[in-house]
Design a protein with these regions (language model features):
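Adenosine-nucleotide cofactor-binding segment
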Residues: 148, 164-170
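Hydrophobic/small residue at the entry helix of a nucleotide-binding pocket
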Residues: 155
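N-terminal Rossmann NAD(P)H-binding glycine-rich loop of SDR-like oxidoreductase domains
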Residues: 152, 160
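NAD(P)H dinucleotide-binding glycine-rich loop of Rossmann-like/cofactor-binding domains
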Residues: 89-150
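Glycine-rich beta-strand-centered segment in the early N-terminal region that forms part
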Residues: 24-41, 51-95
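C-terminal hydrophobic helical "lid"/dimerization subdomain
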Residues: 1-4, 168-188
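Nucleotide donor/acceptor-binding cores
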Residues: 4, 85, 143-145
């Protein structure tokens, strides 16, 4: 067991419900790693958990869905990561607003040297969402025209850039902001 600082809520509400507290986290079990956070992503999902729009199973609860950091320890049988590895994750449940957490290794992505921890923590959840939409929900191909309706947010911006890289034409409604990410068609 380790004691770490965390930000938790004891009930739903505004930002005044965020409390800085010390909590205990366990040791990693089979298929898990303990990650010491170096950067934490902030998302609308976190606000929705805090306000109660996305209910939490119980209180008090740590919120936060994405972070980056360094593996501190691994559970039995874990060979995919080892202590000292830099990783990022998009969590299966809120737990990122803390100094460290225990995470299933299936959620961890090793970070290459050219991606810093702050960038990884800020983009992984949005990037995985964009990846799902562009690769799984509808595989986008060169020459195809796609409409990105909400291109001003994190997911939309990543989708614009990714679609451009794939050679697809992008149509957007947010004229000025979309010019900066290479939109091919701008809708008034």
């Amino acid at each position: 067991m380790s004691r770490v600082n965390a930000v938790r809520i004891h009930r739903n509400g505004g930002p005044e419900e965020l409390r800085h507290e010390e909590i205990e986290i366990g040791d990693p079990g089979p298929g898990e790693a303990r990650v010491q956070h170096t950067a934490i992503g902030l998302n609308f999902t976190d606000i929705h958990h805090r306000t109660g729009r996305y209910p939490l199973p119980q209180f008090p609860h740590v919120i936060g869905m994405e972070a980056a950091g360094v593996v501190e320890a691994v559970g039995a049988g874990v060979s995919e990561v080892r202590p000292g590895d830099r990783v990022a994750y998009a969590s299966d449940r809120p737990r990122a607003y803390s100094q460290a957490t225990v995470m299933p290794i299936t959620r961890l992505v090793k970070l290459p040297d050219f991606i810093d921890d702050e960038t990884a923590a800020a983009v992984i959840l949005k990037g995985l969402t964009a990846q799902y939409l562009i690769r799984a929900a509808h595989p986008v191909s060169a020459g195809e025209t796609i409409l990105i309706q909400a291109a001003a947010g994190g997911v939309g911006l990543i989708m614009c850039q990714w679609a451009r890289h794939l050679g697809a034409r992008r149509a957007h409604r947010d004229l000025e902001a979309r010019r900066t990410v290479g939109s091919s068609i701008l809708l008034p």
